[in-house]
Amino acid sequence: MSLSVGIVGLPNVGKSTTFNALTKAQNAQSANYPFCTIESNKAMVEVPDLRLNELAKIVKPERIMHSLIEFVDIAGLVKGASKGEGLGNKFLSNIRETEVILHIVRCFDEENITHVEGGVDPLRDVEIINTELILADIEQLSKKIEKLTKEAKANQKGAKESLELANSLLDHLNKGLAASSYPEKESEIYQALIKELRLLSAKEVIYGANVDENGISEDNDYVKALKEYAKKNDHEVIKLCAKIEEELVGLSDEESHEFLSSLGVNESGLDQIIRTAFAKLGLISYFTAGVVEVRSWTIKKGWKAPKAASVIHNDFEKGFIKAEVISYEDYIQYKGENGAKEAGKLRLEGKDYIVLDGDVMHFRFNV
């Protein structure tokens, strides 16, 4: 399954610089003026996972295949975007196609870099973007309510219940509250509405506090304020320096680690973002290990073996028989499949087995 992260923010907060660094690309214009991103830029990035390297040391495959994550650099939003201001609705629709919103927020002072609102204020910036997302959701939900009203009058099955919840959700949005904070968001009707409408304010949000080189090791006042706000709203804050992320491009893993350590940082911005996105979306990885390739596969936590097998090929799910499973720890400890098998650590699991993060799996199937 694919994971897509939309990078949003006001103009000139470091979005495109961050995108370029995270994707090790230079295809997103990065300049000191609003709307330098005219079209949304997309790039696929490997999900870093050191476990793949350890598996490869044992198996010695022809290639290593990481899971992939898509980053989408979305043009800077401004007040009125939901009504077509700035670059408008087209870019709100680009956000709609993503699973996670990475909201880059400027948390540094620099006179030479203009701010579209005239000064640095992270919480104001966050509220501007949030308001535009909510307003766009209100417009879309209102159209759905018109349709549901007609269906309810025609006594279509489930229409009255859906209409009742949709009106309740609209009231919630009209109070300036995100769909993600709606009290009944676990209900089946809510989930169906969100799946159909892909409401923007229902998406998982990660705030990227973009600091300068001096603010990377300790939180400045801007970051502290953003973290306090995020905590109240059940969101995560990742502190990153777009300039430092750019400097990491082209460095080996060892060089990157040394460079980050010298700055008092344990993890790159990319690693933080992916780790947090995985956690927010309830994603895990399992592995397949053979002489042709060692590969990581991304699935939802709680998936049973046949469903997990479907990300390789639908036939694996349709014709599922059994799954041979070795935990990552046992695979490493016993030096591979043969050693794990001799130690009694290879298990045969059936259709009800819930796959765990790090499982090394081989599927038996017949179509």
Kindly label every feature range from the protein language model.
Residues 22, 84-87, 116-119, 220-224, ...:
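Short, glycine/charged-enriched secondary-structure capping and boundary segments
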Residues 1-114, 143, 148:
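Conserved G1/Walker A P-loop phosphate-binding module
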Residues 59, 129-133, 242:
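A ubiquitous short alpha-helical element
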Residues 35, 49-52, 65-71, 85-99, ...:
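Amphipathic alpha-helical transducer elements in NTP-driven molecular machines
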Residues 2-8, 13, 19, 147-354, ...:
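C-terminal-of-GTPase-core extension/linker across diverse P-loop GTPases
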Residues 43-48, 75-85, 96-159, 172-186, ...:
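Conserved Switch II/interswitch segment of TRAFAC-class P-loop GTPases
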Residues 25-33, 40-42, 50, 54, ...:
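Residue-level signal for pocket-adjacent positions within structured domains
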